[in-house]
Amino acid sequence: MNKYFLAGIISVVTLVLDQVTKIAVREKMVLWTSETVIPGFFNLVHVVNKGAAFGFLNRADITWQRNFFVVVTIIALGAIGMLLKSAEEKDKFQILGLGFVLGGAIGNLIDRILYHQVTDFLDFYYGSHHYPAFNVADIAICLGAFAMIVSFYKNK
């Protein structure tokens, strides 16, 4: 299978899953609310984040972070394109990884452009210790980064 086709399929599926789940959360849940799914472990929440992963730069007193993250994401998309172009057809881990990162990056970019913030809704916790809420795009970016690390060590 052609590397561009494979990465494209992965990124489109990722993007669709990300946007469909975020739309459902925005339409079905009131902002800043929570619904318990697995008591003591997992909630669905409706929160927004103007910053990056784990709430980095998610502050109301600064307004430039949206434009900053839009520019950084566009630069990253260019880098992903260059990495995909240079990837060998047989390096499926790298190609899959780039597809996941591409879809996730575009998913969060759409939120930043349309809503000036990213919708997060997956809340895992133990007791009172909550992991920062995240979304499908974040999962895809992490999976993609992991696949690219595997590719790097596999080809070393």
Curated annotation (Swiss-Prot):
Protein's cellular compartments: Cell inner membrane
Record-annotated membrane-spanning stretches: 37-57, 68-88, 95-115, 133-153
GO biological process: proteolysis
Pathways involved: Protein modification; lipoprotein biosynthesis (signal peptide cleavage)
Keywords carried by this UniProt record: Aspartyl protease, Cell inner membrane, Cell membrane, Hydrolase, Membrane, Protease, Transmembrane, Transmembrane helix
GO molecular function: aspartic-type endopeptidase activity
PANTHER family, per the entry: LIPOPROTEIN SIGNAL PEPTIDASE
Family affiliation: Belongs to the peptidase A8 family.
Protein's name in the database: Lipoprotein signal peptidase
Protein's gene: lspA
